[in-house]
């Protein structure tokens, strides 16, 4: 049994009009105020989910507004409840279930003022927002947002992948974290069939790139003064991220499965079939611990966009050999080029690895492709 170490502030000497119920408490370390969000009003025990109160500056006990102190309150109007807040250098950004507000310190007599930053927004849970490099990012119910002085909906290539496989009944478990060493924001969430966190999505705000994967984490703390980000697991371990090349959460190294794929590409907007006969992978294995690191590169053709992957017969007399359904090549440390025979109207490239100690970086792969018959040819 863990004994609580917290102290009810109403029991402290000099306590005055302290909130007795609230959605959450927030300490503004820059301005040195204590805030109660979604709390009861003065001389009342009824909770108001849209009310914000703050104590006198540098006081945790004095919540009674007076001409001689800076305690006060403000009620927000857009939304039905306050969900969370995020502090930046200039303001405290407050999220309701349908709007975004800014709280800014004004000094006496107003003390704190509110400004509506955006309406008709959403946030999926109380821990789904985070600040990185002066910008606030958060996961909404069906989309992602950011605030950099103005509220914006973010472009996300993975919206369908994420929101068609998420357990909204467990939305309160969603949490965000930063990995500023790699210019990333992470969100962890439960898949549609799980009540525990098992998926993540990453946004790289420097490159405007999204990625995703499977991982069970219950808490996340960026590196800060440490060398690596720290995360908590369901097996009650604290693990360093971005250290080493393998998954060592259990004490036994396990290879990390990695995969990246391109969008579909074609020639002449798909008016012609393309025949690929050579690829230059442009992959380096700098940082690998494996003696012979390698990845698998796969070229996958399609006869028509949306038709699925298939094996059309080569047309136009350009190929006298069997054209494979897909072309899979092992890329090793000194592989400069690989020869293939693949034909399709659209194609994608995939690179994947599942090897202990393997680390790799993808540059700008190139392919040699030529026309091989027009639309409708067989």
Specify the residue positions occupied by each region the protein language model found.
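Beta-propeller and closely related beta-pinwheel folds
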Residues: 5-174
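Polar, enzyme-active/binding microenvironments
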Residues: 1-35, 40-45, 62-66, 76, ...
């Amino acid at each position: 049994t863990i004994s609580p170490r917290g102290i009810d502030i109403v029991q402290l000497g000099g306590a005055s009009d302290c909130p007795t119920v609230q959605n959450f408490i927030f300490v503004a370390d820059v301005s040195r105020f204590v805030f109660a969000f979604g709390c009861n009003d003065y001389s009342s025990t009824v909770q108001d989910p849209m009310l914000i109160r703050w104590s006198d500056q540098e006081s945790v006990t004095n919540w009674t507004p007076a001409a001689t102190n800076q305690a006060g309150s403000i009620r927000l109007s857009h939304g039905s409840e306050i969900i969370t807040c995020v502090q930046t250098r200039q303001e405290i950004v407050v999220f309701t279930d349908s709007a975004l507000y800014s709280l800014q310190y004004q000094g006496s007599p107003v003390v704190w003022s509110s400004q509506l930053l955006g309406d008709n927004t959403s946030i999926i849970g109380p821990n789904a927002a985070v600040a990185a490099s002066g910008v606030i990012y958060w996961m909404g119910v069906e989309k992602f947002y950011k605030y950099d002085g103005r509220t914006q909906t973010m472009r996300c290539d993975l919206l369908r992948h994420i929101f068609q496989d998420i357990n909204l009944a467990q939305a309160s478990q969603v949490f965000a974290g930063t990995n500023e060493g790699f210019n990333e924001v992470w969100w962890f969430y439960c898949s549609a069939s799980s009540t525990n966190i098992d998926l993540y999505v990453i946004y790289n705000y420097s490159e405007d790139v999204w990625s995703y994967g499977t991982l069970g984490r219950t808490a996340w703390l960026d590196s800060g003064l440490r060398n690596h980000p720290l995360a908590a697991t369901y097996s009650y371990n604290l693990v360093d991220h971005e250290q080493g090349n393998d998954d060592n959460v259990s004490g036994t190294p396990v290879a990390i499965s990695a995969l990246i794929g391109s969008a579909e590409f074609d020639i002449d907007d798909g008016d012609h079939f393309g025949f690929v006969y050579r690829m230059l992978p442009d992959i380096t294995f700098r940082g690998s611990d494996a003696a012979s690191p390698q990845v698998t590169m796969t070229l996958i053709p399609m006869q028509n966009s949306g038709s699925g992957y298939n094996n059309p017969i080569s047309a136009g007399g350009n190929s006298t050999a069997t054209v494979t359904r897909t072309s899979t090549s092992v890329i090793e440390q000194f592989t400069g080029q690989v020869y293939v025979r693949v034909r399709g109207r659209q194609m994608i490239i995939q690179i994947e690895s599942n090897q202990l100690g393997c680390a790799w970086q993808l540059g700008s792969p190139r392919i040699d492709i030529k026309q091989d018959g027009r639309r409708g040819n067989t």
